[in-house]
Amino acid sequence: MSDIMSNFSWLYGKPVATGKLKQLPEHFIVKEILGFEFTGNGEHLMVKIRKTGENTKYVANELAKFCGVKSKNVSWAGLKDRHAVTEQWLSVQVANSDELNFAKFEATHPGVEILEVTRHNKKLRPGDLQGNQFQVIATEVTDIDDVLARLEKVKLAGVPNYFGSQRFGHEGNNVNEARRWGRDNVRTRDNSKRSFYLSAARSWIFNHIVSQRITEGYFSQPVDGDILLDRNDRIVNENVTSEESIQKIQNGELSITAALAGDNQLPTTGTALTLEQPHLDAEPDLMALIRGNRMRHERRAIELHPENLTWSAEGDTLTLNFSLTSGSFATVIVRELLQEIEVERTYSSND
């Protein structure tokens, strides 16, 4: 199977080490961080789940049936990996929950535990997710000393804030479908599928821009015409190549950004524009899809710094612990450390 991420540059060079990820679900543990408290009352039942080997949408649909509501009445802040142990909240719009016995739900769904139940006055939305805590265990790791040396670099300078391979689908099928939709001017009422392919299209172009900056030596070095963001994701208007700006970038106060393509003109100028525009021009079908859906241009930081990064190694097993903000991918951190050996998995039909 081809690795779709091999299209993009490594910040620290292609790893020499190899290893296996998610050999077992408990080798990839994710805990959601919402960043706010629930009111304790309201029309939405908030259910905290721990799921193993199940995807979020399947559990949400099953929970809707159990609560006697439609699937559209169950929502979440973020979708979580299937082949993992993940904790997250689901909100269920249901008036009366006194008769619900969640022990019965657990008995018929062995891959799901109900950890906590409360109420809130609003349903969960994707924007509610602040981030996630991760524990990632890699097994059968070779060249462990090289991995440990790379971890020191990651802790100091971060990794490229690439979108992970899951955004692009199996062997890039989501990107290929997005191209077809743009080329054939496909129209649909399926907002979920439309959003899916638009995200793949914009992510693909973004990754290529970041990859070129690495290749040309501009990953942590601003160029004229760059657009910077502060820690609150606000655009900062200042001399981006000044010593002061460079120092703030190194301190993490400011971030260099790359384009999430839209139907409006790129706001970058000068050298920054020459690093971005060719990648939009190289994908006319993806841009046709983006423009046809009137997506507006956005910016995304090109560097990703995992918070509270710690690690331990025992034999050929590596354990990583870290937190990431919403929208970032744990797999792009591991990508800088080792080449993943594919693990064959068998799934049930709960897709």
Curated annotation (Swiss-Prot):
Keywords: Isomerase, tRNA processing
One term of GO molecular function: RNA binding
GO CC field: cytosol
Active site: 81
Domain TRUD: 158-304
A GO biological-process term: tRNA pseudouridine synthesis
Membrane-spanning parts: none
Keyword DNA-binding included in the entry's annotation: no
Disulfide bond entries: none
InterPro entries from the UniProt entry: PsdUridine_synth_cat_dom_sf, PsdUridine_synth_TruD, PsdUridine_synth_TruD_CS, PsdUridine_synth_TruD_insert, TruD_catalytic, TruD_insert_sf, TruD_pseudoU_synthase
EC annotation from Swiss-Prot or TrEMBL: 5.4.99.27
Catalytically driven reaction(s): uridine(13) in tRNA = pseudouridine(13) in tRNA
Domain of life from the UniProt record: Bacteria
Main function: Responsible for synthesis of pseudouridine from uracil-13 in transfer RNAs.
Family: Belongs to the pseudouridine synthase TruD family.
Name of the protein in its database record: tRNA pseudouridine synthase D
Source species: Aliivibrio fischeri (strain ATCC 700601 / ES114)
Lineage: Bacteria, Pseudomonadati, Pseudomonadota, Gammaproteobacteria, Vibrionales
